Amino acid sequence: MSNSQRPAYSYRPMTPADVPLAHALSVQLKWPHRLEEWAMLQRVAQGFVVEDAGRLIGTAFTCPQGDYATIGLVIVSNEYQGQGIGRKLMELALEACGSRTAILNATLAGAPLYASQGFVDFGHIQQHQGHALPPVPNDLRTDERCRPLTAADRTDQIRLANAGSGLNRHAVLNDLFDIVEHSVGIEREGQLRAFAMLRPFGRGRCIGPVIAESPEQAKHLIAVLLAQVPDAFVRIDIPSDSGLAPWLEEAGLKQVDTVAQMARGTPPQAIGTVRQFALVTQAIG
């Protein structure tokens, strides 16, 4: 269809009233997101929708996080694909980034569009999931201890999350704190050095973010969280260079997908001794 023949679709900002329709669209595409995940993203990010005669047929989000903005849940209904709708949604999402560097996690289908808009690969994310066989937590250093976290630890969690991801996680984590089921951390010399969170997500639970100084710390935290939900379906999204994949496979969390990390500019870098071993979500980073 030529540009002159294309229908005049309506593009506008997403509102809370759009969330159920956006969720229904993702269900049609067999995406696992629950209504609550859509509502969270609508709270912490700027969303866009496209309609055809009042019917919601596409979405996209921009989530500002300091000097960066993550773009996610770029969806176009199957019967409307190939008409440039995804490209227009991406243009709106990029405009919402302002001066921030845009980053995203690209599916195989979406990668060519993002590459054409100036995005370049800088890594890969592996999606692991399944009914876990909770492993025995590995030993920590003698001067470290693992403990449940409370509201008093939230400032330190945000500090670590910012350093580990290179993003400003203040708004994202403050929203997550209200829905998290379990949050555990590793303390050394009276200071929080690492933490991980478990919450409802998709078909069961999700572990993330995981912020730690080493794979050993990350494994310990994940093992402790898995022990809290021994019969649950669990998902975790990890950088491919995290060193966790073989251990997760042994624990029953099989790799089911890989997506490309892409940036339109210099990608974020971890600061100091910690790094991010598991994402919040692929849409948020």
Where are the predicted features?
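Intrinsically disordered, low-complexity, positively biased terminal segments
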Residues: 1-5, 15, 20, 51-52, ...
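A conserved beta-turn-beta hairpin within the catalytic core of GNAT-like acetyltransferases
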Residues: 62-72, 80-81, 200-207
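Conserved GNAT-family N-acetyltransferase fold
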Residues: 48, 58-60, 69, 74, ...
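Conserved active-site tyrosine of GNAT-family acetyltransferases
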Residues: 114-119, 248
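Surface-exposed beta-loop interaction hotspot
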Residues: 122, 127-161
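Ligand-binding pocket scaffold of soluble enzyme catalytic domains
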Residues: 11-14, 19-20, 24, 33, ...
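A short helix-loop-beta-strand connector motif used in the catalytic cores of GNAT acetyltransferases and
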Residues: 34-58, 70, 124, 175-185, ...
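Conserved catalytic-core motifs of GNAT/GCN5-like acyltransferases
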Residues: 101-105, 120-134, 255-267
